[in-house]
Amino acid sequence: MRCADGFYYVVKFQNNPQHTRVLVNDWLGTRLGELIGLPMPAVAVVDVHPWLVEHTPELRLELCGQRKMMTAGLSFGSRYVVAPTEGQVFDYLPESAMAQVRNVQDFAGALALDKWTCNANGRQAAFWKKGRERKFTVSFIDQGYCFNAGEWSFPDAPLRGVFGRNDVYACVTGWASFEPWLSRIEAFPESSMWPLAEEIPPEWYGGEAEELEKLLTKLLERRSRVRELIEGFKDSSRNPFVNWKEAIN
């Protein structure tokens, strides 16, 4: 969807089939990623006018064989990582192309974020390049299943919130490979957490301010557990870090 600022956005509506709370998750997950220095798409609150919904056949949802209009009003917008007229975007690259991703090491930081937020989905990524650029940049998209989607719970498991292939973790040789993101999570200031809640429209969490407060409090409590959760993935049957050289104390 092209918005009033001239940029294109992927827009999620309040009555999406996942859960209204996934709008909160997308916002929080993306903003937290930004704050620890990960390449994330810009996000915005998109006010979708009722007229646009009524007169756009594509803004319909198929549920149980019935077509239903998307809900107008405040929606979540994730800006295209590159405009359609300026470059190319791929949601998949083969292993042979990973050498052409200039920031593939950022997957280690995304893993730290996903363990912190208990992303119940596999890590989603967009690989993009402008014009005639030869190398791709990866941006981390779709944080909707952070905090276990609409449940706002944290059922941690070693293989949750990870990318589907190990090759993106080939550069991980020890704890230093998770820096600076891991240290930024562990030292994430409480004073930076609460303003994020003020950015979120109450409609996205049904006005349940206490539930949102509990979620943020739990996130603060989990800062010290991220290293342990990464270690659980390291020791899993996936054997994701084949180049790990550092001994774990």
Q: Where are the model-predicted features located?
A:
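Catalytic micro-motifs at enzyme active sites that drive phosphoryl/nucleotidyl and oxygen chemistry
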Residues: L63-R67, A99, W128
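Aromatic-acidic/polar surface patches that form glycan- and anion
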Residues: V22, R102-D106, E208
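Short, flexible segments with low predicted structural confidence
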Residues: A4-G6, E95, E190-S191
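Conserved ATP-binding subdomain of kinase catalytic cores across diverse folds
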Residues: M1-D91, D114-A120, F136, Q143-G150, ...
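C-terminal catalytic region of ATP-dependent kinase domains
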Residues: Q14, K130-N249
